Amino acid sequence: DELDFDVPLDFNMAADFAPCESKSLGLYAVVDSTDWLEKCLQQGIKTAQLRVKNKTQDELDELIKHAVELGKQYNAQVFINDYWQLAIKHGAYGVHLGQEDLDIANLAAIKDAGLRLGLSTHGFYEMLRAHNYRPSYMAFGAIYPTTTKDMTGQIQGLEKLIKFVPLMQSYPKVAIGGIDLSRAEQVAKTGVGSVAVVRAITEADNYVEAISALQVAIRSAH
C-alpha cells in the first residue's frame, strides 16, 4: 500500500526556493483572468494564481505584467501558472508548475530570480519528487473530481490528504480539486493550511459572499 511507505530523509539535491510569507496560505484563488484576480484581491484574498490558456504571446505578456502589478498593489502572493519566463521578466512573486514542467523549466533561473515555486502533486510518488526540489509550497490534488481538468485515476480524497499532510510538515500545503463551500471546512481540518478553489468563486451567484463564506469555513477549521 503506497500509504505505508516510509519517507526517505536524505533528499539533498536542491537548495530551498524562497519561502512564502506563512505556512498557512489560507484561501487560495485560482483564476483565469486579471479581472477575476483583482476581484479576489479586493475581497482580502492574499494568495492567488493566474492560470490562463490559449493566449498569444503579447496577450500573455500583458496579462502577467498586470497580474504582478495587482499582487504588489494588494500586497498579495500572486503565482503565475506555467509561464515562468514571463514571471521572471515581470518580477512575479512566484510560479506554479506541474510535474510535467519539472523536466523543461529552468528551475535554477526561477530560484536565482528570487521567485517562489509551487508544485502540483498527484499522489505519493509525485509528492516525494516535489520534495526533492524543495519548493516554496506543495499542492495536493485532486482531492475531489473536478470539471476543470481530467483527473481520471488521480483523485486523492480526504483519506490520502490526511496521510500526506504530516509527511510534509516543513512546507506550506495546498489542497485543490473539486473543493466547494460544502467541502472547504473538512478539507481544512486535515491541517493542510490552504484550500484552493477555482469554480467555487468564479461560478458563484455572488462571488463576494462566496469568498467570505469560504474564508470563514477555512478559518473555523483551525
Give the ranges of each region predicted by the language model.
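N-terminal amphipathic alpha-helix/helix-capping segment at the start of soluble metabolic enzymes
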Residues: 1-39, 109, 162-166
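Hydrophobic faces of well-ordered beta-strands that scaffold small-molecule active sites
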Residues: 23-31, 48-50, 78-80, 95-97, ...
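Active-site beta-loop-alpha junctions enriched in small/polar residues
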Residues: 30-34, 53, 83, 100, ...
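Alpha/beta enzyme core
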Residues: 32-47, 90, 124-141, 145, ...
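Glycine-rich beta-alpha loop segments
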Residues: 38-73
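Glycine-rich phosphate-binding active-site loops on the catalytic face of alpha/beta enzymes
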Residues: 51-53, 99-107, 139-152, 184-217
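Alpha-helix-loop-beta-strand connector modules within alpha/beta enzyme cores
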Residues: 61-82, 99, 107-123, 153-175, ...
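Catalytic cores of alpha/beta
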Residues: 78-93, 122-134, 165-170, 174, ...
